[in-house]
Amino acid sequence: MINLEKILCPIDFSEYSKETLKYAVSFAMKDEATLFLLHVIDMRTFEDDLEAIRVKQIKDEITKQHKSRLLDYVTKEIRNDIKIEALVVQGIPFVEIIDISKKNKIDMIVMGSHGRTGIAHIMLGSVAEKVARKAPCPVLIVKQPGRKFAIP
């Protein structure tokens, strides 16, 4: 029997993240696992705006704001009896997810199948796909509710 002690769930604060979180919470409750919630700030989206400003100070402030937001999110969405580790890091999402999973010896990653849409998805690829290919542990990819496969 597989016993999960550490589960990682990347969060992007979307409604879809809430659905994905339900799966992660369910697994954590079943095995009394620690649930690691991770929010990755992709600073590449801010780089143009930050070039002329004090970059480190702004990055630190953004990280602090996102950590506060993640903790608020956790208290609204998760029961008190689940062990939680809330992490906010800066970097490339799939790289950070894999790095955190290795550093913390994560037993399973639970994440959504889609974050980006449209041209961003085409240009940058799927974070979930990259994580599934490179992760050191099993990855459960939760499909977005209401999405159906259609053959054109």
Where are the model-predicted features located?
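Small/aliphatic-rich secondary-structure junction motif
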Residues: 2-52
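Amphipathic, non-transmembrane alpha-helical scaffold segments
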Residues: 17, 59-67, 124, 128
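Acidic, proline/glycine-rich short linear motifs
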Residues: 39-68, 147-152
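Gly/Ser-rich helix-loop-strand patches that form or flank binding pockets
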Residues: 100-150
